[in-house]
């Protein structure tokens, strides 16, 4: 089984999400389900149906997070990473057309909701960038062929 990795920032966000879902959101929705059920006929009760579905979604996410968080390996910055691309790096790349992209390489579970500026460690781009340095040229396989990118900068969040 592949080790599941996550940045400390990602772990903290998922932990906050679990706490919110379990301590605040789920009790609120449970109360709405109880209220809607008390109105009588559930077969045509839109409030009951909607909130019951929402409760199932919350429970599914809580089960996933409760199982995932204890199994995950938090990857913190290490001084040996400096100057090379590894898990957790913020990387700025540029192609010959002058297009610039900046993103952070993270675990796939960290990319959810409206998260922008993150790519999965499992993506072809991240795999091509790993262990490369600033000014290295990287060839990335894409459905339309090989694309070339140059690494402009590599940064790490060193705090926490």
UniProtKB/Swiss-Prot annotation:
Keyword match Iron-sulfur: no
Disulfide pairings: none
A biological process term (GO) from this entry: DNA-templated transcription elongation
InterPro entries from the UniProt entry: GreA/GreB_C_sf (IPR036953), TF_GreA/GreB_CS (IPR018151), Tscrpt_elong_fac_GreA/B (IPR028624), Tscrpt_elong_fac_GreA/B_C (IPR001437), Tscrpt_elong_fac_GreA/B_fam (IPR023459), Tscrpt_elong_fac_GreA/B_N (IPR022691), Tscrpt_elong_fac_GreA/B_N_sf (IPR036805), Tscrpt_elong_fac_GreB (IPR006358)
GO molecular function, one term: RNA polymerase binding
Keywords: DNA-binding, Transcription, Transcription regulation
Presence of keyword Transcription regulation: yes
Cross-referenced NCBIfam families: greB, PRK01885.1
Role of this protein: Necessary for efficient RNA polymerase transcription elongation past template-encoded arresting sites. The arresting sites in DNA have the property of trapping a certain fraction of elongating RNA polymerases that pass through, resulting in locked ternary complexes. Cleavage of the nascent transcript by cleavage factors such as GreA or GreB allows the resumption of elongation from the new 3'terminus. GreB releases sequences of up to 9 nucleotides in length.
PANTHER family: TRANSCRIPTION ELONGATION FACTOR GREA (PTHR30437), TRANSCRIPTION ELONGATION FACTOR GREB (PTHR30437:SF6)
Family: Belongs to the GreA/GreB family. GreB subfamily.
Protein name in UniProt: Transcription elongation factor GreB
Highest classification ranks of the organism: Bacteria, Pseudomonadati, Pseudomonadota, Gammaproteobacteria, Vibrionales
């Amino acid at each position: 089984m592949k080790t599941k990795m996550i940045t400390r920032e990602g772990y903290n966000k998922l932990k906050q999400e679990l706490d919110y879902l379990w301590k605040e959101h789920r009790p609120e929705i449970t109360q709405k389900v109880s209220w809607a059920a008390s109105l009588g006929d559930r077969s045509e009760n839109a409030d009951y149906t909607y909130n019951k579905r929402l409760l199932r979604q919350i429970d599914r996410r809580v089960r996933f997070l409760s199982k995932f968080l204890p199994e995950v390996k938090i990857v913190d910055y290490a001084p040996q990473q400096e100057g090379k691309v590894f898990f957790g790096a913020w990387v700025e790349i540029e192609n010959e057309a002058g297009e610039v992209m900046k993103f952070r390489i993270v675990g796939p579970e960290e990319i959810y909701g409206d998260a922008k500026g993150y790519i999965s460690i499992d993506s072809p781009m991240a795999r091509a960038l790993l262990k490369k340095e600033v000014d290295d040229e990287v060839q990335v396989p894409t459905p339309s062929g090989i694309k070339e990118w140059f690494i402009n900068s590599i940064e790490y969040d060193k705090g926490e």
